[in-house]
Structures are given as C-alpha cells and as structure tokens.
Amino acid sequence: MDWSIREGARVINMSFAGPRDPMMTRAIQVAASRRIAMIAAMGNEGPGAPISYPAADPNVIAVTATDQTGRLFAAASQGTHVTVAAPGVEIILPAPRGGYQISSGTSVAAAHVSGIAALLLERQPDLDPAQLRQILQETARRGATPDPQLGAGVADPVPALNAAVRPTEPGVPMVTAPPVAPVPDTAQAPAPVAPGTDTAQAAPPPAAPRQATVDPGKAEAKD
C-alpha cells in the first residue's frame, strides 16, 4: 500500500480482510489525505463474524458480494458499514498459473467496484473519494425489497459513468449497456472437484475478436 501511495495511485483495491491493524490504519489515513479512493472486501467469514478491516474503516468503500440473482453471497461477512455490492459468486477469473478458474468471494466483488472507480476517474479525473462513493451509492441497482446487507445496492457501471459527466460538458457521449449474450449455466471442469471446494479450473473457448468504435455525436457504441 505504501508503494501504491508513493506511485500516485488514484484507486487502491484491498481484497483482503482481518482484524484492525495500526500500521494499516495509518496507511489508510495517508491515502485518504491524498484523495486516493480505497475499496475493500467485506470478508468471507459469514454473518456472525466480527467486522473486518480495512473494510470497516470509514475512509474505505466496503464491498460485499452477490450471486447471479442479486442475492447476498452466503459466506459474506456483514455489517452496517457496507457501501455497495457487486457480482462475486462463481466468477471466471484468470488463474495464477495460466488458464482460468471459477471463484467466489467478496474479494472478487471489491475488484469489480475498483474497476468502476477507475473508469469514473478516467471519465472525470477531479472526482474525490467522497464523490466516488456518492455516485456508486446513488446509481446502485436496488431490488424490489431493499436489503441493508447489500448497502445501497449492486454497483452499476453504466449509470455511474453517466452520473460522472457534468451536465455542462459538451461533446461527451453518454454510455449505454450493450446486449449481453446468455451465459451457460454449467461449465466443464477437467477433473472432478471435491465437495466443499470453492474453486474449479475451467477453460472456456476464446471469444471471437471484436472491434468497436464510438461516435462522439451519438449515445451508444457500434460494432
């Protein structure tokens, strides 16, 4: 974290959780004084676990995980400090030794929100962490029955990016979500997976290359 601060990072993702640590608290205070957005995972210790840091630090955007239906990840740690949720159940990720793996957890969700924060800063570089938090909360998707365990709701990059544009800015195209291809409900693993294991190796076929261009005079991207 000290290295990230020295190198001038605008967003720091903290996909880890544990007890409060004085050295980490000091580093967070330094990062906050330099207007660095910090996003952390709530943790995966379940609803009865003590609150975890750094997510519980007031300077940090705390992220929990949801499944494909928008429901809270069963193993997610809980607390009133959660800011938003993001997809974090059975997500296909790059594997450490190549290929891909399917993984679940609030760490995955935190990285998702860190990516949204980076896009917001690219679109509007003068946003500070408090403004990023506000945009994420105000544009989050809420279910028919709001769930306080999800904070403000599930972070949604499209309305968040549009909210980051000043109304007086000319020539900045708005963002629209492209159609999403259906995802198969099953994936084939190369070897049997033991019960209770939370990751499995998978090798989906590579997608066909695509090119996209953006017409600044219109509101959507075209293939």
Can you name each region flagged by the protein language model?
Residues 1-58, 69-72, 96-104, 108-110, ...:
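Substrate-binding/access-modulating region of protease and related hydrolase catalytic domains
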Residues 2, 6, 26-33, 55, ...:
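Solvent-exposed, polar/charged alpha-helical surfaces in well-ordered, non-transmembrane soluble domains
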Residues 10, 74, 88-155, 162, ...:
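Hydrolase catalytic cores
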Residues 37-40, 61-63, 85, 92:
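Structural detector of well-ordered beta-strand residues that form the stable sheet scaffold
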Residues 49, 58-61, 89, 140:
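Structural motif
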Residues 66:
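Carbohydrate-associated surface elements
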Residues 162, 168-223:
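Compositionally biased, proline/threonine/alanine/serine-rich low-complexity intrinsically disordered stretches
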